[in-house]
């Protein structure tokens, strides 16, 4: 059997659909975010990064870098094992306590990523509670979908942010059936924000747990950066919160925050937690420093809001197809995978602007887009240059997408 031909066949299909993913080879410039060096066939060029999830630029913050350097000098590079076998350093213990405090929960549990946290927790909850029925928003992240699927239990998908549809589904479940509503606070591709209070109302009415993914909100929203639930004053009503250390906090890793019994049960039964090496101590130290800083500082959040408001306003003035939403995400609709990649390739090669095309399966076919993420450190001149470049490209739209392909190839 020709196994290689099977691989090539699938790759060719991606190329034909225009959604084969190409990674940009970047080296970020420490202390000079959002600039980076882009390594390509034509050489190395400086670019401005417009699509990073390092939303607040905390990966570059001196307090985070200092904490990581100090941890390496104190304990070395790796953790040395799983959490159960020598891999629980004091940094991990302190970080979990800080996260529990951040979200107002009894406990927190660290994972190597928020993807693993979602996957492991949601699948393990179904093992711990046989017959658990899951009610999941249709736009939930792949990690949540995978965790629900692997659990193998009964699930119902409700229309995105549709409270009436969710209640219709909840009404059909027997009162004594264990239930959990799984949703996100900020949906990263559209920028929509969930009606958390209304969902909590339904959870209380029908006796369901709530599981909230705050991955794209922690650090960015709320008086101490705990997310949308904190901002809206409903954090105490959410049973389990999932978060990341890799976006707003600028480092790496994921976690859940919940009751002591819930976290202990996941700690004791989730394979994705048990059978993997723990986060490096320096990572934990950096995340700890970032969280502590953002609990006290409003500077980064205030500046982010202003930058996002500026970018959205200028895009609207330029009549660019920016998708309206109340969050920090700035999606610009293209609607075709080939066209989308051609536009982003042209931005990179001709304008030294890096933004990644977002295609299926991340978004539905026909809704391909660019996803811009302004940060506190994007300057007025960088914003003006971006708007000018996009305006030039959109002015060329009548000549068809072939013109973008030609420009990108030059």
Which residues does each PLM region occupy?
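Active-site phosphate-binding strand-loop segment of PLP-dependent enzymes
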Residues: 54, 156, 160-212
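PLP-dependent enzyme catalytic core of the Aspartate aminotransferase-like
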Residues: 58, 62, 66-70, 74, ...
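N-terminal "arm"/small-domain region of PLP-dependent enzymes with the aminotransferase-like
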Residues: 2-6, 12-75, 208
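Conserved N-terminal alpha-helix of the aminotransferase class I/II PLP-enzyme fold
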Residues: 65-113
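Conserved PLP-anchoring active-site segment centered on the Schiff-base-forming lysine
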Residues: 122-142
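Active-site C-terminal subdomain of aminotransferase-like
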Residues: 206-209, 216, 221-326, 339
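Conserved PLP-binding catalytic core of the aspartate aminotransferase-like
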Residues: 301-311, 316-352, 360, 366-367, ...
């Amino acid at each position: 059997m020709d196994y290689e031909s099977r691989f090539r066949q699938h790759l060719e299909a991606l190329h034909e659909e225009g959604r084969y993913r190409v990674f940009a080879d970047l080296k970020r410039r420490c202390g000079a975010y959002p600039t980076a060096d882009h390594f390509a066939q034509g050489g190395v060029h400086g670019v401005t990064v417009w699509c990073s999830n390092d939303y607040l630029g905390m990966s570059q913050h001196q307090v985070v870098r200092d904490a990581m350097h100090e941890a390496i000098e104190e304990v070395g590079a790796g953790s040395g094992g799983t959490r159960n076998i020598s891999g629980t350093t004091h940094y991990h213990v302190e970080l979990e306590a800080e996260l529990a405090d951040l979200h107002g929960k009894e406990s927190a549990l660290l994972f190597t990523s928020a993807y693993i946290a979602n996957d492991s927790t949601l699948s393990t909850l179904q093992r711990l509670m046989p017959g658990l029925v899951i009610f999941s928003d249709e736009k939930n992240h792949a990690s949540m979908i995978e965790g629900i699927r692997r659990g193998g239990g009964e699930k119902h998908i409700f229309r995105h942010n549709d409270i009436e549809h969710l209640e219709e589904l909840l009404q059909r479940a027997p009162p004594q059936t264990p239930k959990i509503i799984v949703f996100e606070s900020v949906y990263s591709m559209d920028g929509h924000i969930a009606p958390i209070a209304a969902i909590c109302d339904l959870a209380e009415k029908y006796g369901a747990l709530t599981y909230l993914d705050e991955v794209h909100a922690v650090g960015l929203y709320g008086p101490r950066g705990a997310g949308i639930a904190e901002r809206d004053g409903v954090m105490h009503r959410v049973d389990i919160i999932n978060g990341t250390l890799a976006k707003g906090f600028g480092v790496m890793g994921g976690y859940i925050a919940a009751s002591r019994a819930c976290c202990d049960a996941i700690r004791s039964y989730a394979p994705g937690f048990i059978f993997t090496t723990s986060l490096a101590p320096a990572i934990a130290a950096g995340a700890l420093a970032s969280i502590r800083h953002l609990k006290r500082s409003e500077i980064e959040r205030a500046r982010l809001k202003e930058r996002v408001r500026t970018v959205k306003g200028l895009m609207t003035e330029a009549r660019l197809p920016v998708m309206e939403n109340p969050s920090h995400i700035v999606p610009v609709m293209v609607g075709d995978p080939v066209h989308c990649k051609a536009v982003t390739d042209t931005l990179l090669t001709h304008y030294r602007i890096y933004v990644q095309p977002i295609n299926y399966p991340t978004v539905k076919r026909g809704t391909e887009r660019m996803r811009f993420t302004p940060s506190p450190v994007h300057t007025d001149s960088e914003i003006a240059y971006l708007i000018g470049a996009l305006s030039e490209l959109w002015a060329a739209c009548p000549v068809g997408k072939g013109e973008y392909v030609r420009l990108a190839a030059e």
